[in-house]
Structure formats: structure tokens, C-alpha cells
Amino acid sequence: MTDAPALRITVASASHVPALSDLLSTLFAQEAEFVPNHAAQCRGLSLIIENPSIGHLLVAHAGERAVGMVGLLYTISTALGARVALLEDMVVAPTHRGAGIGSGLLRHAIAHARSQGCARVTLLTDETNIGAQRFYARHGFVSSPMKPLRLLLD
């Protein structure tokens, strides 16, 4: 029996965009609110990568293959008087789930947010995704009394 290789997580570059878009398609296919759209996903990923003040994308690698990702988008909380992060698009390839990659990505994302001066990390999950809610609770996340609302702009 051989040990699994150490989890390698890097900040995404432009060369990661196609693989990250594939991971997003997996995620969006299982979320109630989104539909996979490769062109839109590539545009969004590229906007983040090209503008690090907006956020960072972190990539988990198995060898040379991207097998997981998570995004951190930055804003300011006037309540905290500090920079905060919105954690988005956390996904691990189905073939690599259950191996600790998600936990490693999340720990790395939290540490990365701290290193960027963030005072809080906020995330959203599907209301019915109890497994994800339990996963995040195991990592210290708690429910918020705030309810997200959206307005799509043309």
C-alpha cells in the first residue's frame, strides 16, 4: 500500500481556466439555481485571475490534473471595518471525493483569506444541501440570520 501524495494547492493562473470551467460545470449541474455555461464560466474565472484585488481562485492538484477548486472574492465589511471574503464555487471532482481534498481546500482558503487581511469568510450553500452544511459546520462555519436576496441585472 502506498501513501497518497500530499495535497498540492496553488493560486489559479490563466492556464487553469478550461479545467476549472469543467469543475464548475460539475458544481452547477448539481445546484438548483445555476445551469452550466462554459463561455460565461471562462469569462468569470478569467476576470478573477486577471484582477487579484477582486479575489483568488485556489486549485487542488492530483499530479498535473486540477481535481478541486474554491474561490475567494473580496469586499469590505463596514460592520467589521475590515476586508472580508466570500467563499464561492467550492467543488471537488466526483472521482476524488472522500479523500480529504475538500477539507484541505477549505483549510487552505481560510488561511489564504487570513493572509489577505480578511476578518471573516462568508459562504452560501443550497438550502437543501445538508451534506455541505454539515461539512462547513465541521470546519467552524455557523448559520447566519441574514437571508440572501438577488436581483439579476441585464
Task: Give names to the regions the model predicted.
Residues 113-124:
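Conserved GNAT acetyl-CoA-binding A-motif
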Residues 22-47:
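Conserved GNAT-fold acetyl-CoA-binding loop/helix
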